[in-house]
């Protein structure tokens, strides 16, 4: 029988620290509800002291989600803990996650302290957090570079103080897998009261070893893994939930498993990618669009004869179903509903109507609609519900002439038209839009990515727009890359809450 590994998802906290990946409270609740359906054990919902928005997100997620434990991060500061406890007051299951740096770099350089004072502070904050909640997790920040004997001393002290989980982070992604695993084993073998707490992994991917280090920790006794959807996270990212879960499913001899419903992995991956404007690289393990693609003739021959020759995971196990019904412009609603149900979506009538309309528009431009197309169509629903600015009409002239664009924007219940030239079709269209808004904005970054294959398939555009001291991100998807670019630009303008420029009277 397999031992239980608890999954601690920090997509909404560590994952959201990535520039441009900030979510509003409504979006965070949407992700949290999907994480609940996915079967995660703990959701780290935010860092309440950091901002009113984070505080409110933790509070609202506590009301919206009932099965997982809701966790709030703090520093080793009593005020942080007070605020976190307040944000968690409505949670059915609650945890405070507090801690302090334990490596020489943190003790001496960052904190200007001593090893003895760090132990005292660690014990003090754990005891203080226990006044509010029974479930207290202690993080030994930068444990990857800490002296292992000192680390064991800190861990023993905080467990004695009441910590129920001890988190051993490789904060900088420094460790080799054998080094990280050895640290976990040392704690298991040398901390007398280690049986009173769960050891947790929290690995960063700076050297590309986050998942390997996490698995090494699990093999040596850790029974909680801190992960994010798609491995999203600060700098080079965190351990990927999907990689840990599916590795354990493939290697049943490890005899450790999770409660994750793996058939929702693809849906979760696309939701997070869409809401956070963070495209998944095509060759990403498990959820990349090439993860189950076979181009070599030898590989294709083997897969056609027996999938297991080159596939160790059944695509259906992560919710990526093979098409039984080919969706085209002639497909009816029943076929679309069936396909969406296989992908894990249960839409309201209003959402289905919006999706079907967009589906038909896309199907008119493509021969067949694939699963990845549907995932992005559904992901667009919430963004399309409330549009203060929308594109009514666009015409672009390019080629050997000076690129010229004419756009018609809809502001509420009326329309405005503008024409401009530029260095290319996108530049011309952006210039035309700028004439119609009341803010001076700069298109600072532009990224285009193909969602599926083929010259007539969907392209996804991500932009970064600056307005004074504010920076926002937007995205758009369309078979017409110029149209996708404009939709992305308008998405960013909506985030800035720009309004219509008032025409000056003569």
Residue ranges and their predicted role:
Residues 170-171, 226-234, 249-258, 319-325, ...:
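Short beta-alpha connecting loops at secondary-structure transitions
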Residues 1-77, 324-331, 337-339, 343, ...:
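N-terminal capping/small domains of soluble enzymes
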Residues 4-5, 11, 246, 252-419, ...:
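A mid-to-C-terminal "edge-of-domain" accessory segment
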Residues 14, 18-19, 47-52, 103-105, ...:
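Short, small-residue-enriched loops and turns at beta-alpha junctions
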Residues 5-7, 17-42, 56-64, 78-199, ...:
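Alpha/beta enzyme core
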Residues 17, 30-31, 368-484:
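Non-catalytic terminal/interface segments that mediate subunit docking, oligomerization
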Residues 175, 182-305:
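Catalytic alpha/beta core domains of metabolic enzymes, predominantly
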Residues 471-473, 477-505:
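Mixed-charge, glycine-accented linear interaction segment located at domain edges/termini
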